[in-house]
A protein has these predicted regions:
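Processing junctions and N-termini across compartments
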Residues: 53, 90-93
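Short recognition patches in nucleic-acid-associated and regulatory proteins
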Residues: 70-81
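N-terminal export/targeting leaders of redox proteins
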Residues: 1-51, 71, 84-87, 104-209
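The canonical Cys-X-X-Cys-His
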Residues: 57-66, 93-103
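Short N-terminal amphipathic alpha-helix/helix-capping patch enriched in small hydrophobics
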Residues: 46, 55-58
């Protein structure tokens, strides 16, 4: 009987080790674990929702490839020949803060938010002809830490949740004619939920076409 029990010990040890490896992999206890196939698919689907927001005029008008900001749903050049400037905040005598205050000025139709500025050219989401970059290209820019101010997945989620100029897209105020500016195709809560799904899936990007 003792010999029989002793003979079982290696099998029990192997079984316990296999179970630990399975559980660790399934719940993230083991090193770098690739997302499961269905998790990646969910992440890619969530990314497409994110992309629909990032390429909406409320976002892409400040994520330009041009030397100037854009305005309106048709994304025309900013009036008064405003230009980007060295820090994305305009130039002396015509900087962003000259007109754009901390909040929207609905009486004049001038939008506003804390630290109003253009996104850096490393975060441009359009090509030189003002066409939105592909989903794959935008995704690779957003996840490239050499371009996105060194933000990994959790930092990107926090940025989408809390950054003042991100939040502005869902409170864009009125145009000079008094009509409301359009908002992105998702609510902010939906946008954050999609970002969370994408981040938890490992921030997958679609293949380049």
């Amino acid at each position: 009987m003792l010999r029989h029990r002793t003979a079982l010990l290696p099998s029990l040890f192997i079984g316990l080790l296999a179970t630990r490896m399975f559980v660790g992999g399934a719940f993230g206890y083991g090193g770098d674990v690739k997302p499961a196939p269905d998790s990646r698919a969910d992440g890619l689907a969530a990314w497409e929702q994110i992309y629909s927001v990032l390429t909406h005029p409320r976002c892409i008008n400040c994520h330009t490839a041009t030397n100037y900001p854009q305005q309106g749903d048709e994304r025309h050049r900013h009036f008064a020949n405003v230009i980007r400037g060295p820090a994305g905040q305009g130039v002396a005598g015509l900087n962003c803060a000259s007109c754009h205050q901390e909040t929207n000025a609905d009486s004049t139709g001038v939008p506003g938010g804390p630290g109003w500025h253009l996104a850096p050219l490393s975060m441009k989401w359009q090509d030189p002809n003002d066409r939105p970059l592909s989903s794959a290209e935008v995704c690779r820019a957003v996840t490239d830490r050499s371009k996105n101010e060194n933000m990994e997945g959790r930092a990107l989620l926090k940025h989408h949740e809390e950054a003042a100029l991100v939040l502005w897209a869902w409170n864009p105020g009125r145009r000079p004619d008094g009509t409301m500016r359009t908002m992105p195709p998702l609510t902010h809560a939906q946008f954050v939920a999609a970002t969370r799904t994408w981040v938890e899936a490992g921030t997958p990007c679609p293949p380049a076409k």
